Amino acid sequence: MTYLEFEKPLADLEGKAEELRALARKGEGVDLEKEAAALDRKAEEMLRDLYKQLDPWRKTQVARHPERPHCRDYVEALFTEYTPLAGDRAFGEDHAVMGGLARFKDQPCVVIGHEKGNDTKSRIFHNFGMARPEGYRKAIRLMDVADRFRLPVITLVDTPGAYPGKGAEERGQSEAIARSTEKCLQISVPLVSVVIGEGGSGGAVAFATANRIAMLEHSIYSVISPEGCASILWKDAEKMREAAHALKLTAQDLKKLEVIDRIISEPVGGAQRAPAEAIAAVGEAIAAMLGELAGKKPAELIKDRRQKFLAMGSKALG
């Protein structure tokens, strides 16, 4: 288990409990198992207390936790008959974006998401979930397929942001993001989105301009990273805590501002501690959101989506 900076006291406690268990297994103490169990109870209590008082910066750390379930984990657990589509038919394939045809609870659909990878090799292969223009154009291609065959679209967002490299900019990164966002607003089928980790900038919006948007309890969604914001506003990346607070990037803040529609509860300690439980909760939320849109006519779906985003910000402005 990888522990975050603020979880260090918890790591010490759980480490001591494991040491006692190791000694008990060797037969070096009769009551060590009881002592270990007592430490476990203290650790559980500490874990609950820590996650009850997460500030925006700590939530950012949790959202980035390397052991949180990623897009591929959700697809493998929640979807059947997944058939991936590759390439944008213009330049090439982008492994930061995965997507294809599938079935969700026996209903045919199209699923699209950012994939970060889960170890050094796969993270490099998937470019840490930072999509290039080809990824957004692949998503457009998939949304066109969904629109043609009247299939709902489900997107899973988990990206620090679109890739800012020279090659990506030369191939039209901003145009690709804009076209993907435009396509989200144009398709006449249900579109639901879940932010499962990081929802960074236009790279996230390009997949999440949806009829219904949900966020996991400890995920984040913002126009820029806290570090980037701090560097621009205060010329000091170390002010990321203040920036995280100012950005209103938590699911709780965004629900109040009516940017998102629902918050999906995570297991105590975050999705990384009980991935199967978190994945099941996301599946239930997707089913509920699709149920809300069932029976709506194509024109109603488009109107619903556009009005949702045109009205965005009215809550904050009063």
UniProtKB/Swiss-Prot annotation:
Catalysed conversion reaction: N(6)-carboxybiotinyl-L-lysyl-[protein] + acetyl-CoA = N(6)-biotinyl-L-lysyl-[protein] + malonyl-CoA
Quaternary structure and interacting proteins, as annotated: Acetyl-CoA carboxylase is a heterohexamer composed of biotin carboxyl carrier protein (AccB), biotin carboxylase (AccC) and two subunits each of ACCase subunit alpha (AccA) and ACCase subunit beta (AccD).
Gene encoding the protein: accA
Entry's Gene Ontology cellular component terms: acetyl-CoA carboxylase complex
Ranges for domain CoA carboxyltransferase C-terminal: 38-292
Organism of this sequence: Paracoccus denitrificans (strain Pd 1222)
Protein name (Swiss-Prot/TrEMBL): Acetyl-coenzyme A carboxylase carboxyl transferase subunit alpha
Location within or outside the cell: Cytoplasm
Family annotation (PANTHER family): ACETYL-COENZYME A CARBOXYLASE CARBOXYL TRANSFERASE SUBUNIT ALPHA, ACETYL-COENZYME A CARBOXYLASE CARBOXYL TRANSFERASE SUBUNIT ALPHA, CHLOROPLASTIC
Assigned EC number: 2.1.3.15
